[in-house]
């Protein structure tokens, strides 16, 4: 039997506010346990939550970026369950009136583009953290994270493979960073994925029994967990068994999912409106003000790069994967108008390779976009060849801000375009390689490339390649 995979994702994006969503406590990462939990966070009697206005604005910003509806009024509800790191015995979340409803994003897998619908995005507070490593036979509770503002982004079950799920998660990861509402640091838990996975016979419209895989904090783990879970469910069904609706966790060391607890539905949490928080009324004027402040979004910038700069879709997708990368590219193009493809090639090639090797973000590149544009200018005006430019790039990376011109002059790397000197090198190479000359004249084109290489070697890479080609062809046809 052929099976179809059905996947929906719930993504928790930690909002980049300076304080928590219902208290004034700091959200700085890495503080001593329980040093950033105030009376509201630890649920002392008599305290009341006060909603963080910035969290509301961030949620609206996200909703506008995905073409969603902003609900007004928006209502907070209590999600009731008992857990050691949840001091109140309930979590403040949203159920019936989320702040963001609907919306969509486009993903790319291979050559295929697909639209993924979003169900909703709602605000909620994070729980604390249970730790086990330092307490033999006991559990430690750290409430620093309790009350931290989250935007939970829920998709429709529109994904049909782990590749699509990863592509969707990457699009959202890029978007929340792009619009400045989340730092996206997956190692610190700022961006976490829960995957709802089921399978059904190919062609069926009915949804299968789903299992939820919790707290996947890397794209690689997301892909591997989904692949394992799909194979597990198919194996059970083909053996005559049935799938139990449950929550599972992914064990990266064993590369498997394991049962965590039975899966709860909304009624199990006994949601009801929080009596301590009034419904949030969002004026249209405020929404319009936030819309005006939105940066150019990735999809719009991508289309502009294709139309205005003539870039291929693949190149435009890469350059708009992060706002800092797009800014770097645009600053280069402003210095080198008409050379957008050359700028894109160097960013995606030499710059990205070096950044990946050293584990750096583009914002920490030791070569500024203006400096790199200065290097490429020396290629376009014939001062140096592309090969020499790569050597200059390496020197610029390792220097303390030296410009391309400084390094070119210090190392005497300027390209030689003097006809008489190039003719001398060509004549010397032809005299030393009579067999290759004969091969070329006999129709073997590869011999020509070999001769070009030897001329460039003789000139120590300084000869103008275009002139070498021209002089060499002239000599070989004489």
Swiss-Prot record:
SUPFAM superfamilies: GatB/YqeY motif, Glutamine synthetase/guanido kinase
UniProt cross-references to PROSITE patterns, sorted A to Z: GATB
Enzyme class label: ligase
Catalytic activity: L-glutamyl-tRNA(Gln) + L-glutamine + ATP + H2O = L-glutaminyl-tRNA(Gln) + L-glutamate + ADP + phosphate + H(+); L-aspartyl-tRNA(Asn) + L-glutamine + ATP + H2O = L-asparaginyl-tRNA(Asn) + L-glutamate + ADP + phosphate + 2 H(+)
EC number annotated for this UniProt entry: 6.3.5.-
One MF annotation (Gene Ontology) recorded for this entry: asparaginyl-tRNA synthase (glutamine-hydrolyzing) activity
This protein's UniProt keywords: ATP-binding, Ligase, Nucleotide-binding, Protein biosynthesis
Nucleotide-binding as UniProt keyword: yes
Pfam family membership, one: GatB_Yqey
InterPro entries xref list: Asn/Gln-tRNA_amidoTrfase_suB/E, Asn/Gln-tRNA_Trfase_suB/E_cat, Asn/Gln_amidotransferase, Asn/Gln_tRNA_amidoTrase-B-like, GatB, GatB_C_1, GatB_Yqey_C_2, Gln-tRNA_amidoTrfase_suB_CS
Subunit structure: Heterotrimer of A, B and C subunits.
HAMAP family in the record: GatB
Recorded family membership: Belongs to the GatB/GatE family. GatB subfamily.
Role this protein plays: Allows the formation of correctly charged Asn-tRNA(Asn) or Gln-tRNA(Gln) through the transamidation of misacylated Asp-tRNA(Asn) or Glu-tRNA(Gln) in organisms which lack either or both of asparaginyl-tRNA or glutaminyl-tRNA synthetases. The reaction takes place in the presence of glutamine and ATP through an activated phospho-Asp-tRNA(Asn) or phospho-Glu-tRNA(Gln).
Name this polypeptide is given: Aspartyl/glutamyl-tRNA(Asn/Gln) amidotransferase subunit B
Organism of origin: Nitrosomonas europaea (strain ATCC 19718 / CIP 103999 / KCTC 2705 / NBRC 14298)
Organism lineage: Bacteria, Pseudomonadati, Pseudomonadota, Betaproteobacteria, Nitrosomonadales
Gene coding for it: gatB
């Amino acid at each position: 039997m052929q099976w179809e995979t059905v996947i929906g994702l719930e993504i928790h994006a930690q909002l980049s506010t300076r304080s928590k969503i219902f208290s004034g406590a700091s959200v700085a990462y890495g503080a001593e346990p329980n040093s950033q939990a105030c009376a509201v966070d630890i649920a002392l009697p008599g305290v009341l939550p006060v909603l963080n206005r910035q969290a509301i604005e961030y949620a609206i910003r996200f909703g506008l970026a995905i073409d969603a509806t902003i609900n007004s009024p928006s209502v907070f509800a209590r999600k009731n369950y008992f857990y050691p790191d949840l001091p109140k015995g309930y979590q403040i979340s949203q159920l019936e009136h989320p702040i963001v409803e609907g919306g969509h994003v486009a993903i790319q897998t291979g050559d295929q583009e697909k639209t993924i619908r979003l169900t909703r995005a709602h605000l909620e507070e994070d729980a604390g953290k249970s730790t086990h490593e330092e307490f033999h036979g006991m559990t430690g509770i750290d409430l620093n994270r309790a009350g931290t503002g989250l935007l939970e982004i829920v998709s429709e079950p529109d994904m049909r493979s782990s590749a699509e799920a990863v592509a969707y998660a990457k699009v959202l990861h890029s978007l929340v960073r792009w619009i400045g509402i989340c730092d996206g640091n997956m190692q610190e838990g700022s961006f976490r994925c829960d995957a709802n996975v089921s399978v059904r016979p190919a062609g069926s419209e009915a949804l299968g029994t789903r299992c939820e895989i919790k707290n996947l904090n890397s794209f690689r783990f997301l892909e591997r967990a989904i692949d394992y879970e799909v194979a597990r469910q198919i194996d059970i069904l083909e053996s005559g068994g049935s799938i139990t609706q449950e929550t599972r966790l992914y064990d990266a060391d064993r590369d498997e999912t394991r049962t965590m607890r039975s899966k709860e539905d909304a009624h199990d949490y006994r949601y009801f409106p929080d009596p301590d928080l009034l419904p949030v009324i969002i004026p249209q004027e405020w929404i319009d003000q936030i819309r005006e402040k939105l940066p150019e979004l990735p999809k719009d910038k991508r289309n502009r790069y294709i139309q205005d700069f003539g870039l291929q879709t693949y190149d435009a997708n890469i350059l708009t994967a992060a706002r800092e990368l797009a800014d770097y590219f645009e600053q280069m193009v402003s210095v080198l108008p008409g050379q957008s493809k050359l700028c894109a090639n160097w960013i995606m090639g030499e710059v990205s390779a070096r950044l990946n090797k050293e584990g750096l973000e583009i914002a920490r590149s030791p070569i500024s976009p203006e400096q790199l544009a200065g290097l490429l200018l020396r290629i376009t005006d014939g001062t140096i060849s592309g090969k020499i430019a790569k050597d200059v790039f390496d020197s610029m990376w390792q220097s303390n801000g030296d410009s391309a011109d400084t390094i070119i002059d210090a190392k005497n790397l300027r390209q030689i375009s003097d006809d008489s000197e190039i003719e001398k090198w060509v004549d010397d190479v032809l005299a030393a390689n009579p067999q290759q000359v004969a091969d070329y004249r006999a129709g073997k084109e590869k011999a020509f490339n070999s001769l070009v290489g030897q001329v460039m070697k003789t000139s120590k890479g300084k000869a103008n390649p275009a002139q070498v080609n021209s002089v060499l062809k002239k000599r070989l046809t004489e």
